[in-house]
Amino acid sequence: MIGIEPKYIIIHHSLTKHGKVVDWNAIRDYHMKEQGWKDIGYHYGIERIGEKYAILTGRAENETGAHTSQNKMNFQSLGICMVGNFDLTRPPEPAFKLLVDLCIGLCRKYDIPVENIKAHRDYASYKTCPGKMFPMAELGEEVRKRV
């Protein structure tokens, strides 16, 4: 489906079911080669590239994602994947700041309420995604200050 109107932002981390952290390109390869999808399932990613963190692009914002099938959220949300395992540690501050900025921009662009920034685990309760140590409440607070 082309032309979604996002009402939610869903935050993920890149921890696999086998306990490994994979990078953006490995996720894209898996989604395209193993799953047979046309692109990575997320709309954006945040990963360390060299000495700095960067926002990486995935699917176009108006394309249906493949990141949260529960409650048909793929059809009404943008998916952002933070590369890392946040069951063990908080995201690095520079990566978290990029996520805050990205969420602010998307909330403004699509008039998404801050309370609609959700963790993947909110829909897939059998997961911890985006991690036990991921500061979802802090993310909401930081975005709310600047939206």
Model-derived segments and spans:
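Aromatic-lined glycan-binding groove of carbohydrate-active enzymes
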Residues: 35
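Hydrophobic alpha-helix position signal
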Residues: 31-32, 107
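Glycine- and aromatic-enriched membrane insertion/assembly motifs of diderm outer-membrane
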Residues: 38-45
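Substrate-binding surface in catalytic domains of secreted glycosidases
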Residues: 21
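Short Gly/aromatic-enriched secondary-structure transition segments
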Residues: 24-31
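Basic/polar, cationic surfaces and motifs that engage anionic cell-wall
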Residues: 1-14, 18, 46-64, 68-147
